[in-house]
Design a protein with these regions (language model features):
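Basic, polyanion-binding surface patches
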Residues: 1-107
Length: 107
């Protein structure tokens, strides 16, 4: 994936739990669209969390952490992240889930 070098270079990140109306964001970051990694970060409204990492506006939760290890397994990279902050919203909307190659609403 084109995002791998960005993750490896930065090491600090924010994992965003998206709501079911944010499927377009998930598709961009999954590489299902023609946007480059740089364009993916320009496409949506972001704000900086308390640790300085980018958070997706409207996401249900933000998990901030640092990559502590990574493994290449087959055709995938697996990143192990030490989470140091979890913030969630009070939004009462379903979460977005990717399961069996499809996006689903987790209501």
């Amino acid at each position: 994936s084109a995002i791998i070098p960005i993750l490896q270079g930065n090491r600090d990140l924010c994992i965003n739990t998206l709501n079911d109306s944010q499927q377009d964001i998930a598709e961009h970051f999954a590489g299902l669209t023609d946007l480059s990694p740089e364009e993916r970060f320009e496409y949506h409204i972001w704000h900086r969390g308390q640790t300085g990492q980018l958070e997706v506006e409207g996401a249900l939760a933000h998990l901030h952490g640092s990559i502590v290890d990574q493994r290449e397994i087959g055709t995938h990279y697996v990143f192990f992240v030490q989470i140091n902050e979890i913030r969630n919203t009070d939004a009462q909307v379903p979460a977005l889930l990717y399961f069996r190659r499809q996006f689903k609403s987790l209501a």
